Amino acid sequence: LVDSIGKKISVVKDVVKQLGLKNVEPQQVRAENLMSRKYHFIVSRAVTQMEKFYPWVKGRFRKEDVHDEFQNGILYLKGGDVDEELEALHLNYVCYHLEDYFREPFFETKKVVYIPFEGKR
């Protein structure tokens, strides 16, 4: 788990410890500065436009999938209209509307965008 804000990472480290999670490594670093590691999934809230975010992470995926239903890729929490932004990048994606799963007004415009890793096909 990555965030540039130290207070957030401190909380995440405590949660990881309290839950006894073994496959989580919180790091205080900016996503665009991650260069050496590869990941199965990259999960993010919309920190910037996808055209800026995608180049930061596109080479950061492991080739072997760990999930039967989803191949490795990006899960991106985003509000508003995502289609125009994503279609401009010519990427395959699936948009999950959170209002289909949660009733609170906050989720009415929120989506999780799944972009599968395309590098192994």
Predicted regions and their residues:
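Short, well-ordered alpha-helices that flank and scaffold nucleotide-derived cofactor binding pockets
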Residues: 14-17, 59, 88-91
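Conserved SAM/SAH cofactor-binding pocket of Class I
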Residues: 1-44, 54
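Short alpha-helical
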Residues: 6-7, 48-52, 81-84
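Conserved beta-strand segments of alpha/beta enzyme cores
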Residues: 23-25, 73, 94-95
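A short SAM/SAH-binding and catalytic strip from SAM-dependent methyltransferases
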Residues: 39-61, 76
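Active-site capping/gating segments
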Residues: 79-121
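Short, well-ordered coil/turn elements that cap or connect secondary structure elements
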Residues: 21, 36, 69, 90-93
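Conserved beta-strand signature within the Rossmann-like core of class I S-adenosyl-L-methionine
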Residues: 64-83
